[in-house]
Amino acid sequence: MRSDRSRKRFVFLCVAPATILFFIFMILPTLNVFRMSLYERGAYSPNETFVGLKNFQHLLKDTQFIRSMQNMILLVVVVTIITFAFALVFAAILTREKIKGQNFFRIIFYIPNILSVVVISGIFSAIYKPENGMLNSILGLFRDMTDPILWKGEKLVIPSIIIAMVWQAVGYYMVMYMASMSSVPASLYESANLDGAGRLTQFFQITIPLVWTNIRTTLTFFIISTINMAFLFVKAMTSGGPNGASDVALNYMYSQKDAGLYGYSMAIGVVIFLFSFALSACVNRATSREPLEF
């Protein structure tokens, strides 16, 4: 009896500091964002005016906010699909095909993940330069480049950011999936070969189901992190330009805060928070299935 109490007291003492810090630095600020979204406040004035849902009503009429949300959703969906497709395929190839120098390729693919967003943005901004960038220089060997392609222009800026984001993320998830795939027993693939199953069938019927738990977990984390990464890449590469073509919701939120519209920016933050929560819940629900064991 005394040992049970001692154990509970020990657990409480271990958990209490983290719980208190989480409440102070996560829960309270989040609740304060919800509160501030219902008020109107100037940049340098401590006075607040309660406006209820007025800020949210303005959001529905704000075309730039709607555009920034569309850009954010597009980046999240496309980057997630491409990143996970490449990561799974590369992981399967490097794990199953017994390629020489496997560790070398693992390191090469992983390097972009250890670079900062600023460095990656600088690299791709140099590649995308209209006058002497690598892309236009290569294309100049095959066609007339009197009018250089504006890779960061209004039409191509989102695809250009997508490429940079995928390049940064794919190696990390490839390494994670390689670790999962390497634990799948070779006997399962041998049995599938005897039954006449091809590589593609084995990939979808054996590999994917057996590493699905890992895929599901990483998918949820990646989608949420992509919302933040999209903001970082946009801020570093374009600052939302040109003419707001690459603006995302988080970047627009900060621009409204810098303009002194604190309550309005907090309303944008609430929408992003609810969107992230709803999206993660939908992904969890859509990807839930009975785990397979081997």
Language model: regions and residue ranges:
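A structural signal for multi-pass alpha-helical bundles of membrane permease subunits
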Residues: 2-294
